A protein has these predicted regions:
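Loop-rich catalytic cores of soluble enzymes, especially ATP-dependent carboxylate-amine ligases
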Residues: 124-247
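Terminal catalytic/cofactor-binding subdomain
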Residues: 1-167, 173
Length: 247
């Protein structure tokens, strides 16, 4: 049909038959106050200003008050940014040929960041849910995109007779990771189908999002946060593909 042809043109035309294949990696982490109190967002904002000189990054985006919220390395194109809230830091790495080279750069960034945060008794921690989520304000970064997201999630309070959870602010305290792989026109369907089949296994093997605010009895509460929120109002927005694709 005409609509299918348009979709194929939109999404498949940019797939290049290139022997050079790259990987893209994004990692999100909470920044916690090691005394168990709320994260001091001023500490994190100061960290971003510090990283500009410490790691030779440049400021790519600022919030409504001029505070740097996204930094980029002009050579590697690695970015360090706030993800939704000032208590979550994301590392969005530029394209790389191997995971190992990303790991090498990540280690350099983490060493500098953890050393600076330690001066204020804060640290990046490897949790899928911010350990002090109930102490933090859980407000969005002062930037239109993040305010829009949080406003949308808060619409759940207007949805009656539903099974939506009561934590619309979850966008400010959950973390995740993403990996993007280059594909070709000859293998993209095989890659999509492969990830569809391993996704549920992967989520259990690497589960680290246990939530203390509800009796959910799972270490992958991220699924509940997404599926039983405004994101899950439309089933197509959550979960994995319902079937394997042949064409």
């Amino acid at each position: 049909s005409r609509s299918i042809d348009l979709l194929k043109h939109r999404y498949l035309k940019n797939i290049k038959e290139n022997l050079e294949l790259f990987v893209g990696i994004e990692l999100e982490y909470p920044v916690a106050n090691l005394e168990g109190d709320a994260t001091d967002v001023e500490v994190i904002k100061h960290l971003f200003r510090y990283l500009v000189s410490a790691l030779d990054f440049t400021v790519e985006k600022v919030d409504d008050f001029g505070t740097p919220i996204q930094l980029v390395n002009p050579v590697s194109r690695d970015a360090i940014l706030f993800e939704v809230s000032y208590t979550t830091i994301e590392f969005a790495f530029g394209k790389a040929e191997t995971i190992q080279e990303v790991e090498e750069r990540f280690s350099i960034y983490m060493e500098a960041i953890q050393k600076k945060l330690a001066e204020s008794n804060h640290a990046i921690v490897g949790c899928g849910i911010h350990p002090n989520w109930d102490k933090n304000e859980n407000c969005p970064v002062d930037f239109p995109r993040y305010r829009m997201l949080m406003d949308y999630l808060n619409l759940s309070s207007n949805v009656t007779e539903s099974d939506l959870h009561h934590f619309p602010e979850y966008g400010a305290f959950i973390c995740g990771s993403q990996v993007q792989l280059d594909v070709s026109k000859s293998n993209y369907l095989r890659v999509i189908n492969a990830f569809t089949q391993i996704e549920s296994v992967k989520s259990y093997l690497f589960a680290n999002s246990e939530f203390t605010g509800a009796d959910w009895d799972t270490k992958i509460s991220r699924d509940i946060f997404w599926e039983e929120s405004m994101h899950g109002i439309y089933p197509e927005n959550v979960g994995v593909n319902a079937r394997l694709f042949k064409d």
